[in-house]
């Protein structure tokens, strides 16, 4: 199928082409209407209808005429014209649609035909491409590549023929060999001229010039070695061959100036021929090994190379015109040196294989003005050339060794760098691993500590909960005992007492605020209120003393082992070491004068004397009451009293016990009255501000309830500390002791 085949339009893309045709078709009816349509003109004044040819009548003109004052019913001709125009438009629309449908069908048929043609083409056998990808990543035409290979294969044949040792029995065959080679060269020259005429293969004569020159040199060398005389016909043929070669070179030089791209392609072809010439000089085994290695390398490179790079290398390279002309000269020089080496090898082999030459006539030397080759080589020149070659080989070997050493050093440096990087990475990884291990250990230790701490807290919480439960149980048991005995009901303050205590506390707070405001009138009024509340408190002290001195409470206190230390009603601010320090601070704050301080000291001394006497008497009475209970109701282990003393008492004993309880009550009352009297005497000595300061610093009478509560708590605390073995044994009851005789 031709490469210049038109591109296929798919049915979807064909619509774009059709729309242009449709736009042209739509314009045709407009032109036809302007030329063919004839519209009747109407005379509205006379009512007669006249038909005239009007070009370009549209619906707009008809609508304007219809919208006039006259009615449509009186104009049937206009209606007919409108209907006629509508029919024409419908017909045109139908025609356009049919044409579009026909165009679409045609394009679909063409598309299907082209698809079938492409399928048939792909089913055909494979045809090789016109270009071949060379070993040096260059594109070379297929015919040119095959011709180059054929021409390269021909010189080795001539060389093989030269390398064969000439036998003494066949001198005429040696004479025929150069004739055959000259004929072959003439045929090749004719072929090159034919290829030059073709535009695609203009490069071939230049490419094959070098092998021809090499063959001519071989022929000349052989002609020197043959003992027979050269024929004049052969000399003429050589001259005829050399002359067209010079002409070809003269033709190539202007072509190189005109066509730089062709010159670049020639350089590429020469570079391709160099390794082939070197391979021909090597033995066949080495050539086969090199070919196998090249195939393996090409396979590996093709496998390792990605698709994008393969596509890039398969594309033609057009940027090589930057190469300079001196590269071609280098390649020519290298090829000439190779040819000279081949000549020398052939000469040495022929000398070894051939017998000593027979005497013969000297060979005439022919010098052509046009040729540049030398037909005879002296032994001195050969030695010089050999020395030069040896020097070149030694230099090349030195350069190669240096390059190898440099490469080894570079490889060693790269290996060292890789090892250093590996060591660094290994060290980093080892450090990271050590850090991770340490972090893991630290995390484990922290978690273990956290767990231990949580366990300790949980244990403490459990202990506290157990203690709380124990206290709850003890309180419940105490409440049951109190409700049974009725002691709590007796010791609890009445609501009246609670109100008095609250009033006294509120008055003391108001006094403190008045001191801050420095309002003397308000202070005096509040002090009168305070003294009135204290007077009410006197009446309640007698009842409190009776409750404490009752036989039931004393029995409970005796069973517990409570020892009375001071009055349970009021705090003592006048006696003891703490009172001394407190009074000194109070004097400084209240700015008390020397006279006031002397009077205060006298009052304190008197209070201490009377208070000590009362406390001694209270302790004596308390011990006698407890002794009575221990002898008659219950017994401790310390007392050596028999258990048979629980008989009812006599009247004298009962009266004596009652008197002791009454004396105890009076002593409690006297102690409380002593406190009130001393406080009233202090109010007479101090000013209102000083007295207010004293009340604010120590709220004496408002602490009564707290002292009572403290007394009860101390009682039950002593009871809980006592051991079970020290508990008293109950041997009687108050009701039995105080029975009437």
UniProtKB/Swiss-Prot annotation:
Signal peptide positions (record): none
Region annotated Leucine-zipper, chain positions: 434-441
Boundaries of every bZIP domain copy: 429-492
Higher taxonomy: Eukaryota, Amoebozoa, Evosea, Eumycetozoa, Dictyostelia
Bias kind Low complexity: ranges: 153-164, 172-237, 277-290, 381-390
Superkingdom of origin: Eukaryota
GO biological process: regulation of gene expression
A GO molecular function held by the record: DNA-binding transcription factor activity
TM annotation in the entry: none
Protein name (record): Probable basic-leucine zipper transcription factor I
The keyword Cell wall biogenesis/degradation is annotated on this UniProt entry: no
UniProt source species: Dictyostelium discoideum (Social amoeba)
Localization, UniProt: Nucleus
Entries under Gene3D superfamilies matching the protein: 1.20.5.170
Coiled-coil stretches noted in the UniProt entry, renumbered to this chain: 77-117
Chain segments carrying region Basic motif: 431-432
Principal subcellular localization: nucleus
GO cellular component, one term: nucleus
Record's keyword terms, sorted: Coiled coil, DNA-binding, Nucleus, Transcription, Transcription regulation
Annotated function: Probable transcriptional regulator.
């Amino acid at each position: 199928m031709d490469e210049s085949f038109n591109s296929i339009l798919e049915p979807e893309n064909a619509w774009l082409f059709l729309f242009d045709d449709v736009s042209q078709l739509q314009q045709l009816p407009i032109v036809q209407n302007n030329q063919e349509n004839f519209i009747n003109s109407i005379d509205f004044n006379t009512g007669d209808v006249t038909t005239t040819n009007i070009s370009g009548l549209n619906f707009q003109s008809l609508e304007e005429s219809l919208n006039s004052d006259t009615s449509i019913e009186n104009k049937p001709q206009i209606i007919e014209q409108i209907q006629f125009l509508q029919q024409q438009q419908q017909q045109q629309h139908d025609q356009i649609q049919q044409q579009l449908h026909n165009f679409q069908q045609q394009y679909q048929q063409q598309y299907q035909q082209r698809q079938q043609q492409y399928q048939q083409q792909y089913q055909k056998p494979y045809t090789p491409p016109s270009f071949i990808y060379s070993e040096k990543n260059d594109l070379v035409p297929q015919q040119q590549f095959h011709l180059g290979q054929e021409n390269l294969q021909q010189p080795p044949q001539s060389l093989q023929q030269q390398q064969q040792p000439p036998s003494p029995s066949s001198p005429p065959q040696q004479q025929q060999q150069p004739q055959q080679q000259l004929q072959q060269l003439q045929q090749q020259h004719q072929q090159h001229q034919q290829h030059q005429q073709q535009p695609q293969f203009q490069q071939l004569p230049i490419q094959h010039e070098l092998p021809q020159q090499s063959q001519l040199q071989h022929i000349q060398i052989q002609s020197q070695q043959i003992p027979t005389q050269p024929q004049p016909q052969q000399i003429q043929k050589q001259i005829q061959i050399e002359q067209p070669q010079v002409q070809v070179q003269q033709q190539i030089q202007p072509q190189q100036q005109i066509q730089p791209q062709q010159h670049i392609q020639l350089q590429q072809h020469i570079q391709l021929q160099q390794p082939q010439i070197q391979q021909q000089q090597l033995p066949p085994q080495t050539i086969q090994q090199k070919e196998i290695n090249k195939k393996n390398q090409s396979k590996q490179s093709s496998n390792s190379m990605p698709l994008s790079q393969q596509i890039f290398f398969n594309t033609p390279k057009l940027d090589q015109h930057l190469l300079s002309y001196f590269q071609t000269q280098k390649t020519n020089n290298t090829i000439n040196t190779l040819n000279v080496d081949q000549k020398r090898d052939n000469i040495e082999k022929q000398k070894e294989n051939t017998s000593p030459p027979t005497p013969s006539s000297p060979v005439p030397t022919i010098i052509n003005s046009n040729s540049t080759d030398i037909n005879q080589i002296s032994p001195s020149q050969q030695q010089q050339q050999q020395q030069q070659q040896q020097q070149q080989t030694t230099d090349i070997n030195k350069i190669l060794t240096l390059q190898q050493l440099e490469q080894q050093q570079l490889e060693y440096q790269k290996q060292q760098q890789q090892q250093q990087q590996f060591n660094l990475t290994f060290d980093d990884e080892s450090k990271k691993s050590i850090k991770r291990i340490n972090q893991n250990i630290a995390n484990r230790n922290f978690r273990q500590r956290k767990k231990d701490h949580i366990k300790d807290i949980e244990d403490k919480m459990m202990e506290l909960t157990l203690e709380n439960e124990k206290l709850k149980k003890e309180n419940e048991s105490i409440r049951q005992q109190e409700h049974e005995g009725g002691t709590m009901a007796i010791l609890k303050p009445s609501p009246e007492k609670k109100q008095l205590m609250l009033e006294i506390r509120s008055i003391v707070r108001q006094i403190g605020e008045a001191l801050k405001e420095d309002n003397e009138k308000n202070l005096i009024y509040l002090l009168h209120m305070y003294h009135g509340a204290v007077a009410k408190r006197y009446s309640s002290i007698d009842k409190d003393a009776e409750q404490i001195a009752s036989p039931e409470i004393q029995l409970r206190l005796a069973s517990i082992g409570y020892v009375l230390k001071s009055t349970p009603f009021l705090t003592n601010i006048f006696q003891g070491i703490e009172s001394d320090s407190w009074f000194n601070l109070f004097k400084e704050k209240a700015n008390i004068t020397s006279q006031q301080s002397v009077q205060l000291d006298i009052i304190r001394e008197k209070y201490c004397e009377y208070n000590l006497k009362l406390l001694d008497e209270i302790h004596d009475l308390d011990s006698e009451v407890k002794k009575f209970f221990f002898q008659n109701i219950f017994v401790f282990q310390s007392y050596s009293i028999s258990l048979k003393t629980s008989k009812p008492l006599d009247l004298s004993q009962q009266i004596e016990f009652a008197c002791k309880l009454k004396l105890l009550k009076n002593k409690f009352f006297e102690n409380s009255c002593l406190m009130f009297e001393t406080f009233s005497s202090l109010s007479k000595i101090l000013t209102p501000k000083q007295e207010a300061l004293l009340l604010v610093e120590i709220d004496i009478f408002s602490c009564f309830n707290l002292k009572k509560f403290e007394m009860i708590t101390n009682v039950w605390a002593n009871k809980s500390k006592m051991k079970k073995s020290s508990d008293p044994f109950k041997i009687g009851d108050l009701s039995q002791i105080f029975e009437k005789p």
